[in-house]
Amino acid sequence: MASKDIVHPQPERRHGSETHEFTMPLLSPTLTPSHIPSQTPQIPPEVPAEVRDRLPLPETLPVVKCMARARIPTTQGPEIFLHLYENNVDNKEHLAIVFGEDVRSKTLYQKRPNETQQDRMTRGAYVGRLFPGRTEADYDSESNLRLNFDENGQLIRDPSTTCSGEPILARIHSECYTGETAWSARCDCGEQFDEAGRLMGEAGHGCIVYLRQEGRGIGLGEKLKAYNLQDLGADTVQANLMLRHPADARSFSLATAILLDLGLNEIKLLTNNPDKIAAVEGRNREVKVVERVPMVPLAWRSENGIKSKEIEGYLSAKIERMGHLLEKPLKI
């Protein structure tokens, strides 16, 4: 079966000023566990229909296609497999940072007309590990693993070669140049990214869907203007609204489509954001969040982590204005 072509639209600017309140009977523990919780999971309740109706969830999911995959050794120890995606809703290259060689993209592994085994290895559609002299993508002689395909060239998800067991950890992470690259103490984005990677590396499996939605969807330039407004006294929500943007302009339907492409229909979601649970599950619950794993700031549970008046104001606004599922630590 031929894969769908990706047609890139022209970008469209979104404006709005509406914020919403949504409370769930679910609070984070005082500490984020240092290991994956197994005895007392944070089970997300059913998201009410009116919440799904209120969120801008599309009737149909975007079309995504994984164009390349590569093994990345990391400075932290565990290897990752970086997947690059194209899609039909924007002109950006979004990423899936995957822990575990056996998490496989349907669109990456789909057989393509006139391709060779070398072509498949070059784009990352192989099993096992690459090594000098290897000639087959679909068979790894060192591990004796072989991929099988149906008559349409689609990968058969065999448990011996493809992850298909318990739901794995997932995080939907939006790009944050300031927090991840410029050492910003205005937000905890970089800290959450690192913590998600630590937990996934410890678990052996996981997926960070990395969406190119800088500044909660408003872009880096507008985000820098928002920072100036915050220095003038606005909080993170007020600053966006003053710039005629929504408090949160992101869409997570691309993440839903990417998770489905990777065969991750059930996940344990690392998040404090209740709206993200409904948004990632999608209007028709194509993905199911079976557990919420809280992301408690490091500074709230140790001497480490980000400490600044800016981060305290940022976290307070997330809790008080955006309904994030966190409890501030008691100050004695």
Swiss-Prot record:
Pathway: Cofactor biosynthesis; riboflavin biosynthesis; 5-amino-6-(D-ribitylamino)uracil from GTP: step 1/4. Pfam families: GTP_cyclohydro2. It catalyses: GTP + 4 H2O = 2,5-diamino-6-hydroxy-4-(5-phosphoribosylamino)-pyrimidine + formate + 2 phosphate + 3 H(+). The keyword Cytoplasm does not apply. GO terms for molecular function: GTP binding; GTP cyclohydrolase II activity; metal ion binding. Belongs to the GTP cyclohydrolase II family. This is GTP cyclohydrolase-2. It comes from Meyerozyma guilliermondii (strain ATCC 6260 / CBS 566 / DSM 6381 / JCM 1539 / NBRC 10279 / NRRL Y-324). The gene is RIB1.
